[in-house]
Design a protein with these regions (language model features):
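Charged, solvent-exposed interaction patches on well-folded alpha/beta domains
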Residues: 1-94
Length: 94
């Protein structure tokens, strides 16, 4: 009933791999409104609270683990975008 929307053209294997990473870091599907897949092989996640998380196409377990910490960090509570595509950089609009 509350399944997220999916945007972009991706192979089933690509999503299954990404889904495995999501479950490993403890991300709840019920908190996600949409997934966006890009031709470069990377994903964005839009949460139901309005936050857009821009992910790189490598090191996803590590990056998603850090992203969840940032999402709940006081300094990022007003952020609508957290961009983690550049290694060792956090870009936020909040």
């Amino acid at each position: 009933k509350d399944l997220p929307y999916f945007y972009g053209k991706f192979k089933r294997e690509e999503f299954l791999k990404f889904s495995n990473v999501i479950s490993k870091v403890g991300l709840e599907i019920k908190d996600i409104s949409s997934f966006y897949f890009f031709p470069s092989g990377r994903w964005d996640i839009k949460f139901k609270d309005g936050l857009l998380l821009k992910l790189p196409n490598t090191d996803l377990i590590n990056v998603l683990s850090k992203a969840l910490l940032l999402k709940n960090n006081q300094n990022f509570l007003n952020s609508k975008i957290i961009d983690l595509r550049i290694k060792n950089r956090i870009i936020s609009n909040g």
